[in-house]
Swiss-Prot record:
CDD domains reported for this sequence: KH-I_PNPase, RNase_PH_PNPase_1, RNase_PH_PNPase_2, S1_PNPase
GO terms assigned for molecular function: 3'-5'-RNA exonuclease activity; magnesium ion binding; polyribonucleotide nucleotidyltransferase activity; RNA binding
E.C. number: 2.7.7.8
UniProt xrefs under NCBIfam families: polynuc_phos, PRK11824.1
Pfam families (UniProt xref): KH_1 (PF00013), PNPase (PF03726), RNase_PH (PF01138), RNase_PH_C (PF03725), S1 (PF00575)
Protein name: Polyribonucleotide nucleotidyltransferase
């Protein structure tokens, strides 16, 4: 890399995009500073000098958020950034997915790519700057990275596609798409959409690719100017003679084992076939390195045979046709005391989702770099080890769980009613009980069932399906509803979720260089057929959301007051609102516009709290008659509470028509009496009269005669 700082500039959507190379982090293999508008991201790539003895490529990608980037100091006692936010984890995955396929097969050096967000302009997405920065850091380094990639966000406002839409444009857009790829093809898609047809989603992807081509060309010029020569790669390879021997000895056994249709029986058959071959070589007392090579060759054979059977003979491991979905079943109200639950089973993949309804005060508070401060709809995904019949430590959610949860959330959020129509916080938890591929899509289906069981008035039911691809040269086969083996050994995992009307979420990961438009179009079309079949199965279980909420769900009353009356409800230091909560046991959430949401499982207490609040904000009207309660007696009169928080004085001369010597001669504490409002003085004091009410009653009787 050049020792002196070099600057390279272009534009993205009219905003300046500048790359600095050669000044910062010079001890790393490659580094660059990206300035996109006022967004600044430092991307750095490093690699170990020697390969690791691992059966996989050890790549780590981190997207690091610094709260100083938006002028915030972290909360808590420590005042440091803690664990990564959900946005940071999802952005790390977003960058990892398009760059991972572009390292040489068999490359085992440890590679770490870190992008640190140092300044944020909300209209210039930091994750896009980090993705392009990661590609540049790898491309200018000596790490063997095959070719640059770029990524963009795509929105659609009033039918027009937009690259990297602003915050204002995002609010109006019916598509939230992130697409990445090389100059030749797409290799990563992440999208949420408002029931958008497949053909429009495809056009959005291809629209994004046109901008990607330009940004890759920009990077290629940059690499010519300051890129380094790549270091020699030591690839994990096996001896040719050994490969031939293992193939001849194991092929028939491997082919037969692969075609055992039941997952566990197939896994056991493959394991037994491998063990027999390994045992044969161990009997010959060969070196440990040879045994490792034999195991690697056998793993490759399984992959090659699965792929050959699919592409050449159109035979899937479990015997299905390429567009066939595994057996489907579903049911609702699985758990009696939860607010809603749904169980969805597709072959040997099973998810149980639970819907919990809460008050609007139960929203998730977000503390990150985005403008969004809270979230009222959440989907969480859990993947225990028992779902694949294994043991293992129980830890908090990892990147995969967070990513799958976010995908389900994105797929479902477009059908969630707004808080005016349905003033609840909604939390979905999906428990994966069995896993043989496509668990994230099963969680979407189960979550739809759970919400319908809970009585959430969703706009339309959502189903999801995972598509696969096996490509060999120009031959390719697209698979519907891929299982675990097809996902692990295939070239693509393309998840599509949506309603009968259109797509609500897409996620595509591939292990090859990229996909053409024709393959994407065919995959989307095939996915739609599968989605419709799954929706039909789900609707046979429950056709529409239940009309009544669960008896165990909180009941919510809504009301509206004038914003300047909010202080009357809250009271000094929250005294008034806490008194209402203590008296009724409800939860009260107040919005700045005067909207009030009262929630509890007891509707009578909700009504009581509402009445108290109505009394607090009620205005006393001169000339009106009220039934009040005597609260305090003085020599000069009685203080009467008209309603909660409002009282007035009945002067001793206004208690009765005749002269009153002592207030106690007419009224006592806690007496209920009818009083008329005579006046409200300049200080807001209310003067009442019992005598006026008596006189009015006499007049009314005389007029009635």
């Amino acid at each position: 890399m050049a020792e002196e700082k070099q600057l390279f500039s272009t534009e993205i959507s009219g905003k300046k995009f500048t790359v600095e190379v050669g000044e910062l982090a010079k001890q790393a293999n490659g580094a660059c500073m990206i300035h996109y508008g006022d967004t600044s991201v430092l991307s750095v790539a490093t690699a170990s000098s020697e390969p690791k003895d691992l059966p996989f490529f050890p790549l780590t990608v981190n997207y690091e958020e610094r709260l100083y980037a938006v002028g915030k100091i972290p909360g808590g006692f420590i005042k440091r950034e803690g664990r990564p936010s959900e946005k940071a984890i999802l952005s790390s995955r977003l960058i990892d997915r398009p760059i991972r396929p572009l390292f040489p097969d068999g490359f085992r050096n440890e590679v770490q790519v870190i992008s640190t967000v140092m300044s944020v302009d909300q209209d210039c997405p930091s994750e896009i700057a980090a993705m392009i920065g990661s590609s540049i850091a790898l491309s200018v380094s000596d790490i063997p990275f095959e070719q640059p990639i770029a990524g963009v966000n795509v929105g659609r406002v009033d039918g027009e596609f937009i690259i990297n839409p602003t915050i204002e444009q995002e609010a109006k857009s019916d598509i939230e798409l992130t697409v990445a790829g090389t100059k030749d093809a797409i290799n990563m898609v992440e999208a949420g959409a408002n029931e958008v047809p497949e053909d429009i989603m495809l056009e959005a992807i291809m629209f994004g690719h046109e901008e990607i081509k330009r940004l890759v060309a920009f990077q290629e010029e940059l690499v010519k100017a300051c890129g380094q020569d790549k270091f020699d790669v030591v690839l994990a390879e096996s001896e040719e003679e050994l490969v031939e021997n293992v193939h001849s000895e194991a092929k028939d056994k491997i082919v037969n084992a692969i075609q055992v249709q039941e997952k566990h029986a197939r896994d056991e058959a493959i394991k037994q076939a491998k063990n027999e071959i390994v045992a044969h070589y161990e009997e010959q007392e060969v070196e440990e390195d040879v045994i490792k090579q034999v195991k690697s060759i056998l793993d490759s054979m399984v992959k090659e045979e699965v792929r050959r059977l699919i592409t050449k003979e159109k035979i899937r491991p479990d015997g299905r046709k390429v567009d066939e979905i595994r057996p489907l079943s579903s049911r609702i109200h699985v758990l009696p005391r939860t607010h809603g639950s749904g169980l969805f089973t597709r072959g040997q993949t099973q998810a149980l989702s639970v819907c919990t309804l809460g008050a609007l005060g139960d929203v998730q508070i977000l503390d990150g770099l985005d403008l969004e401060e809270s979230k009222r709809f959440m989907h969480h995904y859990n993947f225990p080890q028992y779902s694949v019949g294994e043991t293992g430590p129980i830890r908090g959610p990892g990147r995969r769980e967070i990513g799958h949860g976010a995908l389900g959330e994105r797929a479902l959020e477009k059908v969630i009613p707004d808080d005016k129509e349905f003033p609840y916080t909604i939390r979905l938890v999906s428990e994966v009980l069995e896993s043989n591929g496509s668990t994230s899509q099963a969680s979407i289906c189960a979550s739809t069932l759970a919400m319908m069981d809970a009585g959430v008035p969703i706009k339309a039911p959502v189903a999801g399906i995972a598509m696969g691809l096996v490509k060999s040269g120009d031959d390719y086969t697209i698979l519907t509803d891929i299982q675990g083996m097809e996902d692990a050994l295939g070239d693509m995992d393309f998840k599509v979720a949506g309603t009968a009307n259109g797509v609500t979420a897409l996620q595509m990961d591939i292990k090859i260089d990229g996909l053409s438009r024709d393959i994407l179009e065919e995959a989307l079309s095939q996915a739609k057929k599968g989605r419709m079949q799954i929706l039909d199965s789900m609707l046979a279980t429950i056709k529409e959301p239940k009309e009544e909420l669960s008896e165990f769900a909180p009941k919510i009353l809504t009301m509206a007051i004038e914003p300047d009356k909010i202080r009357d409800v809250i009271g000094p230091s929250g005294k008034q609102i806490n008194q209402i909560i203590d008296e009724t046991g409800v939860k009260i959430d107040i919005e700045q516009d005067g909207s009030i949401f009262i929630s509890s499982t007891d509707n009578e207490m909700n009504k009581k709290a509402k009445q108290i609040i109505e009394d607090l904000v009620r205005e006393v009207e001169v000339g009106q008659i009220y039934l009040g309660k005597v609260k305090r007696i003085e020599k000069f009169g009685a203080f009467v509470e008209l309603f909660k928080g409002k009282d007035g004085l009945v002067h001793i001369s206004e208690l009765a028509e005749e002269r009153t010597n002592k207030v106690e001669d007419v009224v006592s504490i806690d007496d209920q009496i009818m009083v008329k409002v005579k006046e409200i003085d300049r200080q807001g004091r209310v003067n009442l009269s019992r005598k006026a009410v008596i006189q009015d009653e006499k007049k009314a009787k005389e007029q009635a005669k």
